Amino acid sequence: WGLAGMRLGFAIGTEVTLAPSGPSMQDYLGPWAVAGPALTIGTRALSDDIWANGTRTRLAQDAARLDGLVTAKGGQLVGGTTLFRLYEVDDAAEWQSRLAQSHIWSRIFPYSKTWLRLGLPHPDRWTQLEAAL
């Protein structure tokens, strides 16, 4: 959902599909407990169909908008989600440096000189991103 700072995940299945045939779910969880506020917010978010559908729609629209901005500057969409997008660009380090000068944080990868990952900007930061690109 892109709720900043909230870490909450789910594993949904039957006893058969979740039965450990290798590592158990507990092995994947690590030592981090789920915070009470995350449970409360997650419960509310999953119970509010109007909010959930509106959020899905907004995230999809924002991802398409970001794709349009980056591809107009020569980037090519490689993949991603509605929260993060992965692009192939000519020089990812140069793009990252240019974006950082405008306080826009991105991620590059040590195994690819051309991959750049961007998250969706806050609604009032689109102009800043457009200017940086």
Feature locations, PLM:
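PLP-dependent enzyme catalytic core of the Aspartate aminotransferase-like
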Residues: S97, Q101, Y111-L133
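Short loop segments at secondary-structure junctions
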Residues: G13-T17, V89-A92, P123
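Alpha-helix boundary/capping detector
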Residues: W51, G68, Q96, R125-W126
